Amino acid sequence: DMCGLFGIRRDRDLTIYDVRVAADAIASIINRLGRCDSSGHVITGPVWEYFADHERMFQPMLRHTPFRENDAVYFRQQLVSRDMDGLLREITLDRANGLHGKTVIHPAHVAAVHALSAVTHEEYHDALDILAGESGGVRASSYRNKMNELKPHRNWALRVIDRAAAFGVTRQGVSFVDLLTALASPGSANS
């Protein structure tokens, strides 16, 4: 365990990226081993070790709005009470930092990792648009909310296509809340 080498155990209110020594080590590993050239490897995110209710020092890390819009306010409360908000934040930060997937030691974490690993309709179509471009340049996303730079975003697009092959692509309008609630409900596979 990386933190164990330094006698550190992060609190459940912190992500691994809040622990500087661990975040710096992850950055070095990704820089050395996670490149998109032929020398790179797939690197998964570190384990999230918390799963039970506890007294919180900091505010929860999940916004209310997406859950209100999906009639899932109680579900959000359940996620927060089980420290899943920290896990969801860390999964998002893992991907932003070049990690793919998550090391899981508790069965309750599997659904969250899978839900946030699915490729959104928007990501998928942006990736296809980038990969279809034959020359450099910039195109507006079909969602009209960002620019897709054909050369700089090419490696990102390739990784999105790989992730789509492993975890699937959501339908248009399906949110992470939809996926989380569907995966948390036994026998539900509609999203």
Model-derived regions: residue spans:
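Expand to "…catalyze enediolate/carbanion chemistry for C-C bond making/breaking, isomerization
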Residues: 1-191
